[in-house]
Amino acid sequence: MYTTPELQEFGGANAYLRSCASRSVLDLLSNKWVCLVVGALASGPMRFGALRRRLDGITQKMLTRTLRDLERSGLVAREVFPTTPPQVEYSLTPLGGNLAVLMGEIRVWSEEHMGEITDARSHYDARAEEPVRPL
């Protein structure tokens, strides 16, 4: 699949190289909503409305896009139940469950260190001529 010698040297994947396909995976995983959706589904299957209520601030459009991206990547399974109206439930696949462990650790780390990050940003902004806008 890869012809770049550097990729072959690392067994076909090296995210530090522009030509490595794993960068698209990192792009997906760096989205805050992906982290939060995976975390919410780690506790078990959920319907769209329950997910939306759990994820304060997410729009319907963003939740739909995030779920589609996760389903496309094999991290989330979508099951439609034959009811009237149809009910749809989302759950993590085994691959998504594996990711949930890592995402959970990142979420916990961010919660534990948010005070330090906020302080560092305040100190930086105080030294800068113009405050840096939040990400």
Cite the ranges covered by each PLM segment.
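N-terminal helix-turn-helix DNA-binding core of bacterial DNA-binding proteins
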Residues: 12-62
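Short amphipathic alpha-helical segments with heptad-repeat character
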Residues: 38, 42, 89, 97-100, ...
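Residues within the helices of the helix-turn-helix
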Residues: 49, 68, 88
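Alpha-helical initiation/capping and key positions within long helical/coiled-coil segments
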Residues: 50, 62, 91-94, 98
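Beta-hairpin "wing" of winged helix-turn-helix
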Residues: 71-91
